[in-house]
């Protein structure tokens, strides 16, 4: 794959108070590498507090198409991720898309 077709995007959203991640970070960062020609998330990272949460969210995002927005991805996050940072993750994804 031609790396010139890949662009790094990041979105940040405030975390709810009282959760572990908010004690370490005040915001969550969601960072994605997007193939802009194919409109697909090639790689993802985030600043959730635990390795398993980061791994789950990143694996969920990788390979997803953003051609029609992030609504379907947000719905999948809503279904699969039942942590307190769910709304912040979805907000960060929407910021990336906008």
Protein language model regions, located:
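Short, compositionally biased leader-like segments
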Residues: 1-12
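Active-site- and interface-proximal helix/loop "cap" or "latch" segments in soluble metabolic
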Residues: 14-31, 36-98
């Amino acid at each position: 794959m031609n790396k010139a077709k890949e662009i790094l995007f990041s979105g940040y959203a405030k975390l709810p108070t009282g959760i572990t991640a908010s004690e370490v970070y005040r915001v969550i960062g969601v960072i994605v590498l997007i193939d802009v020609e194919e409109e697909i998330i090639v790689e993802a990272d985030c600043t959730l507090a635990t390795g398993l949460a980061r791994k789950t969210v990143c694996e969920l995002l990788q390979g997803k198409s953003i051609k029609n927005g992030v609504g379907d991805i947000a719905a999948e996050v809503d279904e699969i991720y039942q942590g307190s940072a769910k709304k912040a993750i979805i907000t960060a994804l929407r910021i990336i898309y906008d």
